[in-house]
Every structure is written in C-alpha cells, then in structure tokens.
Swiss-Prot record:
GO terms for biological process: gluconeogenesis; glucose 6-phosphate metabolic process; glycolytic process. GO terms for cellular component: cytosol. This is Glucose-6-phosphate isomerase. One of its GO terms (molecular function) is carbohydrate derivative binding. CDD domains: SIS_PGI_1, SIS_PGI_2. It is found in: Cytoplasm.
Length: 430
C-alpha cells in the first residue's frame, strides 16, 4: 500500500492474499473505528491525542516561545530533562530523529531513571554551566521523576537561589498534582498535559513540543504532521488507511501465522528511540490477558553481527517490521584513498554511504525472506520534523486498532501498577 508519505510493503509475506485479507478484516476494522470515534472503546475518553491535531495551539505555542526566549535571555546552554516511560522515550525519539538538523546550541541531559551513576554523571556535566530544569509528570508522584526532581531542583536552587524559578518548567496536569502546587508557590512555568492523554500517547503534547523548540526545531511542523496524518487516516477503508492496514497485518501474522514476536528493525542508530517508542506503544497497549505479540527491535547493521545469526537460522517464531526512511538529511561520498587503496575499497567509490546502507537493507531482507522470515517494510518519505509528527500519529492509530483487534483496552496499563504497589510498600510510602 502506497501513500504520499508512507508505504507499507507486503511482498515479503508468505501466503498473503490482499483481497482475502481485506475481506476478512474490513468489517471488524470499521466497527472498531466507529467505536473509537464515539468513545465506546474501554476507557474511550482517553483519546485526547486524536483530537489534538485539530485544536487551536496558538496559546500553547506562545507559552513555549516565551520559555524559549527566557532561556535564551538567560544564556541557558544545558537542559536537564526528567521524565519516564512515554514522557521520556518519545521526546528522545524526536530529538534523535531530528538531531542532524538541530539548530540551537543546547545540550539536553536525559535522566529517565534513578541510577545514582547517571544522576551523578549529569550533575558533573552541568556543573558551572548555565542550565535549566524541565520535568514531566502528570501526578508529580511517579517515583523516578519525583526523586530526580528533588535532587536537581536542590542543585538549581543552590546555584541560582530564588531565581531558580526562572529556569524551571513543570509539565503536568492542569489543576491537580504535586507539581501544580509547586508551580503555584514558586512561580515555575507550567505547561499542561490534557487529562485525557495517556503517557505513551503524549509525545507531541507540551513536553515534546517544548524540547523540540528548545533544540531549534519547529513545533508547528510536528503538529502539521499529526494533522496531515489524521486527515489521511480519517476513513477506515483498508485500501487507503495504511495504519489500520499495518495493524491488521500484525493481527494476521499473530493469529493466522502463529508468530509470537515482532522484531522492528531500522538501519540508523539515531532511530533507536523511535524503535523504543514503537515497542512501548504496542507493548503497553497490547500486553494484557496473556494474549499479545511480543514487540522487540534490532538496529542493523550493528545487530547483524550478533542477532543476525538467530534471525537467519534460528526458530522462525517472529516476523520483522523494517523501517526505512527514503530521503535523509545528509549523505557522504566515500573519498579516494590517500593510501593507494590498501583497504581495497575502491569498488565503492561510485556509491554514497546511504546507497551502501540501503544495499545492506535490501540484501538482509532478501536473505531473511529466503530463510522463511515474514517481513513488513514501512518506508517513510523523508527525515523531517513534519515526518516525525506524521509517523507518531500514524503509530498511535495503528496501536489503537491493533490492540482493539485483540480485544484489549489499549488505554490502560494495570500490570504496571502491581510492581508500584509492592515497591512503595517496601519503601514505606503511606
């Protein structure tokens, strides 16, 4: 299936007949689509991410611009960002995906856990720098950002005293939660996460938009990407809706082909967090009731020298989803050797780095397919701010449909609460 911005290639799926496939899934997809639009799915009110692209963002963008100007006036060079789960993975995915085009001279230090090693390393890195603190947490009580916020807020206060408030941004609920109280008391900038947007669907809420802006990317282009995707995916027809098509393919491979694992693959290390975001969206939305695909990922060509052996000759209980970006920001030519071709690479002189990488991709797809691996290939048109917004919304729609086809509530995560209750009991929180 081909559209202007994204192509789903199914020619490396064994036994796949598109006409039979669409006939099998179309009615159920139509039903789920209408239930989603009418908020009739379990926790169906948690669809704020779907209505977000159509909203007027002038007020939010004005707030973000004000923060960016203030940080610029304060000559901020480093940002410490605190967040966990979707409030971390997605934001990191944006910045890594767009890193070659970063225009602002800002260094973002992510603190996504309570590792003393990582916290100490970031504290050393910002010592003597002009830095600011951004925290994302709806409740303000999630352990990881709460602990790290105490630590780094103390550091910020020690360095800047009362003026630390000018360098602090809280991204949280509109009216409730610990961070709201702190913001009101100390005058921190406060950006609001709508209460009907869950963490893994919140990448392009204020957290992602603010960090994108601070790093010199255009949040309007991210939002335009989501709006374009929403418009293109408004119809549930599997002949045109590529996100639903992909969701149904995953279900077909899981139920009909009995494949239990999806290995999502990309060929650039900068896409690692995009793959992690894919894993979180599907894993947290579908991992319920003992009935779900197990989403994992590999970065090629690096992992070809480890996991490549398993994929080629191991048990075929998995399928691959390969993500390729058609147009890159940059390319490089292999230069002529200054050492008389002693590395014997002159046969590559007519090829660019991207050509070599794409050739490796084609060869791996062919090799794995010959070894009975089913492969879906997703091709994104370009590596741009707009494209990230488009693909993130596309993945969110695919997640909603895929999990709903399995009969799950795609908007909750009750399993995550089990360890939290045990952990807080052991730590003594009342």
């Amino acid at each position: 299936m081909e559209s202007k911005w994204l192509t789903v290639d199914t020619k490396h799926l064994y036994g796949f007949d598109e006409a039979i496939f669409i006939q099998k899934y179309q009615k159920k997809v139509n039903q789920i689509h209408q239930q989603f639009l009418n908020q009739q799915l379990p926790d169906g009110h948690m669809n704020g991410w779907y209505s977000q692209p159509d909203q007027d963002h002038k007020g939010l963008l004005k707030q973000i611009n004000t923060i960016a100007k203030q940080f610029n006036a304060l000559k901020v060079t480093d940002i410490v960002y605190l967040g966990i789960g979707g409030s971390y993975t997605g934001i990191r995915a944006i910045l890594d995906f767009l890193k070659p085009e970063q225009k602002a001279n800002i260094k973002v230090h992510f603190v996504p856990d309570i590792s003393a090693f990582n916290i100490a390393a970031v504290a050393r890195a910002i010592k003597g720098k002009s830095w600011a603190l951004v925290v994302t947490s709806k409740s303000g009580r999630t352990l990881e950002p709460a602990v790290t916020f105490r630590y780094f807020r103390n550091l910020l206060h020690k360095q800047y005293k009362q003026k630390h408030a000018l360098r602090t941004v809280v991204i949280t609920d509109a009216v409730k939660g610990l961070l709201v109280g702190m913001s009101n008391q100390y005058g921190y900038a406060h950006l609001t996460i709508p209460s009907n947007i869950g963490g893994r669907f919140s990448t392009l809420s204020p957290a992602g938009l603010l960090l994108a802006k601070l790093c010199g990317h255009d949040p309007k282009q991210l939002l335009l990407g989501t709006l374009t995707a929403k418009q293109e995916l408004a119809n549930s027809d599997l002949n045109t809706n590529s996100a639903y098509y992909y969701a149904a393919l995953r279900h077909w491979l899981y139920t009909t082909k009995k494949l239990k694992i999806e290995v999502t693959v990309a060929y650039h290390s900068a896409y690692e967090y995009l793959l992690l975001q894919h894993r979180q969206l599907f894993g947290e939305s579908e991992g319920k009731g003992g009935k779900s695909l197990f989403p994992t990922f590999s970065l090629f060509t690096t992992d070809l020298h480890s996991m490549g052996q398993l994929y080629q000759e191991g048990e075929k209980n998995f399928f691959e989803t390969v993500i390729q970006v058609q147009t890159q920001f940059h390319d490089l030519e292999l230069p002529p050797s200054d050492f008389n071709n002693d590395d014997q690479l002159d046969y590559l002189l007519a090829k660019s780095m991207n050509e070599i990488s794409n050739t490796a991709l084609e060869a791996v797809v062919e090799a794995h397919f010959q070894s009975n691996v089913n492969i879906i290939k997703l091709t994104l048109k370009e590596r741009t701010t707009f494209m990230f917004g488009y693909f993130y919304f596309w993945l969110s729609m695919a997640t909603m449909m895929s999990g709903s086809l399995l009969g799950h509530n795609v908007f909750d995560q009750p399993g995550v609460e089990v360890y939290k209750q045990l952990m807080f009991a052991k730590l003594g929180r009342e």
